[in-house]
UniProtKB/Swiss-Prot annotation:
It comes from Paracoccidioides lutzii (strain ATCC MYA-826 / Pb01). GO terms for biological process: Golgi to endosome transport; Golgi to vacuole transport; protein targeting to vacuole. The lineage of its organism: Eukaryota, Fungi, Dikarya, Ascomycota, Pezizomycotina. It comes from the Eukaryota. Keywords: Glycoprotein, Golgi apparatus, Membrane, Protein transport, Receptor, Repeat, Signal, Transmembrane, Transmembrane helix, Transport. This is Vacuolar protein sorting/targeting protein 10.
Amino acid sequence: MILRRLVLAGSLLLATAFTSAKKADSPIITATRFDHEPINLFYFGDSDVVMLQDIKNGDVYVSRDAGVKWDMVNLDGLKGQALSLWSHPTDRTKAYILGKAGKHWVTNDQAKSWHEFSADVEFFQSLYPLVFHGKDSDRVLLQGQKCFGRDCKEVTYYTTDGFKTVDILMENARGCNWAVSTPIFGDGLNLSKEVNDRIFCIVPGLQSPWSDYNRLLYSDRFFKQDPGTEAPLDSGRAVSGVVRTASVKKYLLAAAKSARTSELALYVTDDGSQWHRAEFDGHRVEEDAYTVLESTNYSIQIDVVAETPSAPMGRLFTSNSNGTYFTRNIDHTNRNSLGFVDFEKIANIQGIILVNTVKNWEDVEMSALVEKKIISQISFDDGRTFQPLKAGKHDLHLHSVTHLSNSGRVFSSPAPGLVMGVGNTGGHLKDYYDGDLYVSDDAGITWRKALDEAHKYEFGDQGSVIVAIFDEGRTGKISYSLNHGKDWKEASLPDGIKIRARILTTMPDSTGLKFLLVGSAKKDSEVEHYVISISFTDMEERTCGKDDFETWPARLNEKNEPDCLMGHKQFYQRRKADVDCFIKKKFQEPVPQFEPCKCTVEDFECDFNFIRSTDGKSCVPARNLPVPEGACKKPDDKYMGSSGFRLIPGNACIREGGVELDKQIERVCTDTLTVPVSGEIAVQKTFFTADNYKGYFYLERKDSSKGDDETVIMITSELQIYITRDHGKIWKEIFPGESITRIVPHQYFDDVAYFLTNSGDGWYTLDRGENFRTFKVPIPPNQDKLPVLSFHPERRDWLIWTGAVECKTRGPQCHSVAYYSTNHGSEWHFLMQYVRRCEFIKREARGSSNNLVFCEQFENENPLNHHLQLLSTDDWFSEKKVHYNNILDFATMQEFIIVAVRGEKPQDSLSVGVSVDGETFAYADLPANVQIPVQRAYTVLESRTHAAFLHVTVNNIEDHEYGSILKSNSNGTSYVLSLSAVNRNTYGYADFEKMQGMEGVAMANVVGNVADVEKGAAKKYRTMITHNDGAEWTLLSPPSKDSEGRDYSCSTKGGKPTDKCALHLHSYTERVDPRDTYSSPAAIGVMLGTGNVGEYLTLKSEADTFITRDGGITWEEVKKDKYQWEFGDSGSIIVIVPESRPTKTLFYSLDEGKSWKEFQFSEVEMLIRDISTVPSDTSRNFLLWGNEVGNGKKPGIATVNVDFSNLKERHKQCVLNEEKPEADDYYLWEPIHPFQPNGCLFGHRAKYHRKRPDRDCFIGRELQHLDSIGDICECTRSDYECDYNYEPQIDGTCAPVPGLQPLDPKLICMEDPKAVEWYEPTGYRRIPLTKCEGGKQLHHIIPHACPNKEEEFLKKHPGLRGVGLFFVVMGPIGLAAAIGYYVYTRWDGKFGRIRLGDTGSGGFFASDSLFISIPVAIVAGVVAVATALPLLASSLWRSVKGYARVPGGSSSQRVYSSRAAFAAQRADYVGVVDDEDELLGAEDFDEEENDDRGQV
């Protein structure tokens, strides 16, 4: 495959052949001229048949005499249609031509005949189109994409009979692999037939298309009647975030990356069934920062990028035989930015490796501007030790893989022991053009100069012939040697041709006497391309006899004796260097001979469950050892167990008389447990020399991250900074005396945080506080309370720094300046001045450039005019684009960019600008009766369900604020009213919260006495809930009885809530810490809250605590009084502690709140200010934050770690079998819509893993809760919401907004050139989240052809012609008139309202009847159209809850860029940090970014 990257060309046109004069003592050279450069040249194995391709016109050529003569492949339909040419990697008879128009061709007889097959697929560069089975060459996967206009989706085909038949395997797969992907996969393991059929595919998550949610599915039946099973990558569990798979030798690898970290987890299997996580000797593996190298049959070689922000360097690791434990071989390997590593194994000789390393690595780590000094080293013992290359007494350095100059291997070939390279002697490697050609004929032990200047080279006849050609410019000759490169002769190219050599190659096994040279020549102003055949077959050389060969040892030890590796010595019969003969054994590769050795220490590796000790001399347990049957009745018992070693599988050493490291030894039973089970909850209290804490945040380890730390960082009221790596058991002060004034956690990567001083300089960590590095900034921080650091969502090391210059006197010349860095601040570059803020805009949902940056800049660089422009660039403002000239602010979310745009006049309403790609903006259509006066505000609530939610202020009088929630369509441009009178506070934050982990469930608090509030009365609140993403809202159903078994004072109606009797909960605006949400993404279906049952929400001091386990449909009272709560172990542990009153005890539940146990955590009463755990809620540790207040109290703030890890009920790991998910400790839970009798929610039935509440076990690392999306349901009214210019009524109906002028529904034809039709409005639109199919299509009823699209329209609707079309068009008009009159005179007073509520069967004119709904819409005369950007089909964002606020005029409250800043109370931060985002700020109070819920 390297070849098809190296030879990038136009195309070929066969022209003329030239042949040099035949001489008995020199090779025959034949040149064939082409008009364009050839690509995709390859040999069929064990043959002289060669193929290449003309990329310009798609022609394919074949030669059957090793390149002397060429013929075009003539096939019906092939002319001009070939896209690419591929050879089969293991079958020497097969090749493939992939075409442009869905037609493709395969040969099974080395291009003698071709078979055409069809597959509707387009190909793209990021995916290999052909994936081959390792042992059956007829089994092939074909991967690409299908495109319908701009809408493309991946598609994978498969064949089991060599493309005689082709079937679709799967759509939307992001890469598939056969389990048996190499010829040696599973050798010696007796694989079942199922594994031979097994295919692994990376597919999108069930609820999200983002790569962080990718799943790895496998099927043994080609996904037929089998949706696939998730691969149990991690201890039997599925893992999300799988980004790629790869096969090497006998291993299959899968790489996974969790959200909010750049660290990868690598999983390995050698049988396609059992997977293990690879461990890299404590080293982190970063995304796009590892390279799987050429490996052996018994280990994997991987180069991992060293943790440096500057020039790429790596560390070389080698695995044990099952690929699970990797040992470091050598540091500072040379890499390039493309991931290529200077590493090569010498062909067909075990254990010899040639690498390049960076000599001045310390200087390079300090600065990216330092040029690397590269040196070459070689290992003769499989990478255990390395030594310099020697040319005489001098060190030799050779150019390697990062500077490829030819196809195929860099140094070696199948010719035994012959190695060549271009380089120089001296202290380090120089430029390629300063190098000479060197050769070794003893596998790299000694080297000598072969030719001056750089040359391309190739081996033939098992090394009897070496051919070289000058590689520093044009030449008219070749050089060749017949004695291992000692002496050289020259031969001229025919007809005086002088070419620039591109490729010099020969047959893959290097056993022939023919070579191919590809190059280009200049003739006048034209470029000519040549394929030149070089043949030594007719030279007057005899055939070698027995005496012409020597037994050559492939490896020598330090005593110059044949060396042992993998239990044997290796030898070859090799032609002596100085004999005059050719071997002439064409297609017969040299066969190694082996001599067994006695077993030594090197023949053993660490056994399962063991890893190398620090000194590398022994193997120590890596985890709890399994308890032998019947052993370990007592802790002090002993048993016979593994020594920690095992013989490397495949090792052939002689046991007798050798070392026996794998002999069982006596072990004590304490080895089977790392920590004794106490059965009790552990407590650790720590006091600090400060009265309070200013804030804290978690640097959470993600599933793909190594280690087991639970890191928390706290800043006290005395500005001391502490860190704990074990969740508060041991705290350590960091940066004492350094005057840290800002702590900035990375907005998108939880491993990273910055600690800054007033000057802006400081420290940062990339590994959750394990190490800290210094950080330098280009200018001091700004003094305008603007965020100083902005982060890239996908590139961890890309930063924008907003500082200030000329500010010593704070005069008018003081202004902000933005700089950017792409290497963690090692280098800074000017971006823009007079900015308010700049942000990277790249999101996975957008196809935009990584470099896309938005900046708010004062117009004409003049802050006094108060006009902020919104600008963008994708080239660091070499060029810029102005989107808006006068904005208030903008908010970036995963799916949308929303801009608050000022009107031309001060009294004008704010406009909403929306973009989904960061390039094209459109104004959003808000309901006509919803305006945003300048002096008011709107709040961007969230955008993770294909729709944006805005809270628009209606009343902004202090203490009387409320507004309306608007919901957008899927591209954010058309909004409808979702809920009125939603409460907000003075700072603009609304009582609205999405339930985490479940689709479409949200709660909001509304003002229940709006009319009185408008007259000055205090607000009274009610809590509402939606189960269909805001389309319908209802009150919360109260419990039937309280926690003491007593009835409530009010009564419901048939178990349903009423205006007088419902459950009401205190919401977002009343929280001290905004991280204290109702729900957790880890505890599916469970929510807790404090409130009361009645007509309205009462005082918080009167609140009790409630829980729901079914997503908010039913509730129970947990305890009287108000409690703080936290979920642990994905909800299998719930802890509550009294709020605002002293206590010594907490309560915990192990069964989702059905029962509670009391636990005393302190001898002295404490006032607990907060309870916390890791943001994912997966830990069994909790932290209580508070002060002692009782008798014997100690001064200062204290933390109390409460550890449930040793609780006997939570010490055993729960078992989840992905193939039988309900067989063990889990069951499948299906959420339902409370008004849907068929159990459908958003058009499908989803099933979630939930732990059985009665099982005594712990869940552990984050569980993929969503198991499957089952049946897709037919569409019903619950899958629709009110369309634009319709609004919901109190009774659940939808009515047109009075007095509106209808929009033109034909706009869709103008906005989307591909649109064929437009539809008459019905008042309905699909909920963006729904997956329903068929059923009631309430949004698309009556179609009309777009102008000039009548023909396409009729093809789409072939029955609509002539009279039939007349009746289809005219019939509904007459029918609408008749039914409209009937409705007008007979209906129940709800004329024009379309109910989206319960689906009943009320007959012909039932309120849910499609027949009545449509005429009502027509008579109402309301036209709804989405003025949509044709940009985004569908997307989904995870559960994040940040705010980004756009305030009103000068009298409005000051901007809080996040709810964290609001919640932390700004006054507490004065003197610590100059802007809201910095100290534990906008992004630190949980994983919640300022990226998704924005107050604007």
